[in-house]
């Protein structure tokens, strides 16, 4: 959520940000509501002053033994009017708040302006894509041929965009997740968390999934709970309605969870394989930072994700998302895209974002300055570290051999019982 004072004092800043995001939201709606709310509050204050004056006149008349019935009647009318205006002001405030919940974050000044993914800016590339002496296959062909990925039985169990992992594939998925977690905990200083995989509506609102993106979520209607689309949701909201100590910042949490997404609007995209699933595993990184240091933390978090890819020997590139392609809650986002030789292109495997105080305002997460003073909103950051299924895809495609086998990257072998090569 944006700062109310910014909307009131500098609506042109917000209007410019919305234009950069190519949003059709009209800032005039807020201005109209805010003007109406202020007018109601002014009228209420005026009537309260009138009520106080009338109360004093009633008391004076009673002390003098005079008839105060007319004054009392007038006082009752003023009180009823105040009550009605208070209710109207609350209704306008609620409508204003609902409107504010639909407004995306303001892009940071370093974010390139653009409409969509075609306007994103490449920052760097790491690693050289392998030159194959044969035509590289796509991961679903490799996984099925080696008996590890079973899309047919998954379809029988749950329908499209689900997968059953067998034997080495199940172990490789687990190995990747454990390697990611161990690295984040031991090398990067994150605290591991195992959060609920279902959350309530308030929690989804805190990180920005609601109210605008409900169609992308799986909802348990009888409880009005939602399956998490990412561990960012529960991890960020761990400190909702709390005041942290400045000396404890930055805080870093990591979690391995299943993620559930309806993939609304993705009809016909990535219909084969593991790239776009209704359920997938991801290891998430979340950080709470001091406002003055949050962009340093973004670079650090991006480095944590990059190091995993480098240790796995997977070529990748880093992209800065343009203003029109960023997520709703982000003020700046880097995407890491891994090279997939079977598809002959880079595909997203991690997204690292600084959300500024946007989520903290929605979830009411603040910190108390070390020197005293009024609590301030923290800055929240989140990043994939990494998407496990997509990393498995990258391992299969980059380490495939002409005989159909797949070499296991060295860093994963301790997690695979020393296995060096996957064969049928």
From Swiss-Prot:
Keywords: Aminoacyl-tRNA synthetase, ATP-binding, Cytoplasm, Ligase, Nucleotide-binding, Protein biosynthesis. GO terms for molecular function: ATP binding; serine-tRNA ligase activity. Its EC number is 6.1.1.11. Gene3D superfamilies: Bira Bifunctional Protein, Domain 2, Serine-tRNA synthetase, tRNA binding domain. InterPro entries: aa-tRNA-synt_IIb, aa-tRNA-synth_II, aa-tRNA-synth_II/BPL/LPL, Ser-tRNA-ligase_type_1, Ser-tRNA-synth_1_N, SerRS_1_N_sf, SerRS_core, tRNA-bd_arm. GO terms for biological process: selenocysteine biosynthetic process; seryl-tRNA aminoacylation. It comes from the Bacteria. The keyword Protein biosynthesis applies. Its main location: cytoplasm. It is found in: Cytoplasm. L-serine binds at residues 230-232, 284, 384. CDD domains: SerRS_core. ATP binds at residues 261-263, 348-351. One of its GO terms (cellular component) is cytoplasm. It is an enzyme of class 6 (ligase). The keyword Cytoplasm applies. It catalyses: tRNA(Ser) + L-serine + ATP = L-seryl-tRNA(Ser) + AMP + diphosphate + H(+); tRNA(Sec) + L-serine + ATP = L-seryl-tRNA(Sec) + AMP + diphosphate + H(+). Consists of two distinct domains, a catalytic core and a N-terminal extension that is involved in tRNA binding. Catalyzes the attachment of serine to tRNA(Ser). Is also able to aminoacylate tRNA(Sec) with serine, to form the misacylated tRNA L-seryl-tRNA(Sec), which will be further converted into selenocysteinyl-tRNA(Sec). Belongs to the class-II aminoacyl-tRNA synthetase family. Type-1 seryl-tRNA synthetase subfamily. Homodimer. The tRNA molecule binds across the dimer. This is Serine--tRNA ligase. The gene is serS.
